[in-house]
């Protein structure tokens, strides 16, 4: 599970150019 989250964050960073936590990582929940 932790790996999947890391991958999501990675894709999110590449897609938006910003860390997930900066955009409000609540979207992942």
Swiss-Prot record:
Source organism of this protein record: Ovis aries (Sheep)
Task: Provide the assembly information.
Answer: Component of the complex IV (CIV, cytochrome c oxidase), a multisubunit enzyme composed of 14 subunits. The complex is composed of a catalytic core of 3 subunits MT-CO1, MT-CO2 and MT-CO3, encoded in the mitochondrial DNA, and 11 supernumerary subunits COX4I1 (or COX4I2), COX5A, COX5B, COX6A2 (or COX6A1), COX6B1 (or COX6B2), COX6C, COX7A1 (or COX7A2), COX7B, COX7C, COX8B and NDUFA4, which are encoded in the nuclear genome.
Locate the compositionally biased regions of type Basic and acidic residues: 1-13
| GO MF annotation, one | oxidoreductase activity
Function, in words: Component of the mitochondrial respiratory complex IV (CIV, also named cytochrome c oxidase complex), the last enzyme in the mitochondrial electron transport chain which drives oxidative phosphorylation. The CIV complex is the component of the respiratory chain that catalyzes the reduction of oxygen to water. Acts as an assembly factor that specifically drives the homodimerization of CIV complexes, mediating the formation of mitochondrial respiratory supercomplexes (respirasomes) containing two CIV: supercomplxes with two molecules of CIV show improved activity.
InterPro entries under this entry? Answer: COX7a, Cyt_c_oxidase_su7a_sf, Cytc_oxidase_su7a_met
Keywords of the record, alphabetical order, are:
Membrane, Mitochondrion, Mitochondrion inner membrane, Oxidoreductase, Transmembrane, Transmembrane helix
Q: Which domain of life is it from?
A: Eukaryota
* Name of this chain's protein: Cytochrome c oxidase subunit 7A1, mitochondrial
Gene Ontology terms, cellular component aspect? mitochondrial inner membrane; respiratory chain complex IV
Q: Which family does it belong to?
A: Belongs to the cytochrome c oxidase VIIa family.
Q: Is Translocase set as a keyword in this record?
A: no
| Topology versus the membrane | Single-pass membrane protein
Q: Which SUPFAM superfamilies match?
A: Mitochondrial cytochrome c oxidase subunit VIIa
GO biological process terms, semicolon-separated: mitochondrial electron transport, cytochrome c to oxygen; mitochondrial respirasome assembly; regulation of oxidative phosphorylation
Gene name in the database record: COX7A1
Cell membrane among keywords: no
Pfam families per UniProt: COX7a (PF02238)
Covalent S-S links between cysteines: none
UniProt-annotated location(s): Mitochondrion inner membrane
Q: Where is this region: Disordered?
A: 1-29
Q: Which pathway does this polypeptide act in?
A: Energy metabolism; oxidative phosphorylation
């Amino acid at each position: 599970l932790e790996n999947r989250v890391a991958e999501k964050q990675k894709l999110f960073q590449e897609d938006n150019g910003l860390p997930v936590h900066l955009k409000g990582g609540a979207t992942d929940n």
